[in-house]
């Protein structure tokens, strides 16, 4: 699966801004069929960042969210800034 097909869009809200600042986490809508391994590979390819942990959930509307915790060497704020959301 192509990295651009896996990662659909970042989620920007007060909650996600708090996660970026305090927990070094990013939140994206991802392709519903994408596995955690697909998401990990897409983050590595698109942002050159190593992933420490991924949690996923499917919303009642059927969209899949990925909560991505980056390793300590990487800053979620810098990745968010490169996306233009922070």
UniProtKB/Swiss-Prot annotation:
Record Gene3D superfamilies: 3.30.70.330
Pfam families in the record: Ribosomal_L23
GO biological process, one term: translation
Superkingdom as given in the UniProt entry: Archaea
GO cellular component: ribonucleoprotein complex; ribosome
UniProt cross-references to PROSITE patterns, sorted A to Z: RIBOSOMAL_L23
Keyword rRNA-binding found: yes
Annotated keywords: Ribonucleoprotein, Ribosomal protein, RNA-binding, rRNA-binding
Gene Ontology molecular function terms on file: rRNA binding; structural constituent of ribosome
Disulfide bonds: none
Function: Binds to 23S rRNA. One of the proteins that surrounds the polypeptide exit tunnel on the outside of the ribosome.
Oligomeric form and interacting partners: Part of the 50S ribosomal subunit. Contacts protein L29.
Family: Belongs to the universal ribosomal protein uL23 family.
Protein name, per record: Large ribosomal subunit protein uL23
Organism: Methanococcus maripaludis (strain DSM 14266 / JCM 13030 / NBRC 101832 / S2 / LL)
Name of the gene: rpl23
């Amino acid at each position: 699966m192509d990295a651009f097909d896996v990662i659909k869009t970042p989620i920007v809200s007060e909650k996600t801004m708090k996660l970026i600042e305090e927990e070094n986490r990013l939140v994206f809508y991802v392709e519903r069929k994408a596995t955690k391994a697909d998401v990990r590979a897409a983050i590595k390819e698109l942002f050159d960042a190593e992933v420490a942990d991924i949690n996923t959930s499917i919303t009642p509307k059927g969209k899949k969210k990925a909560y991505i915790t980056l390793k300590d060497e990487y800053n979620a704020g810098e990745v968010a800034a490169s996306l233009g959301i922070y």
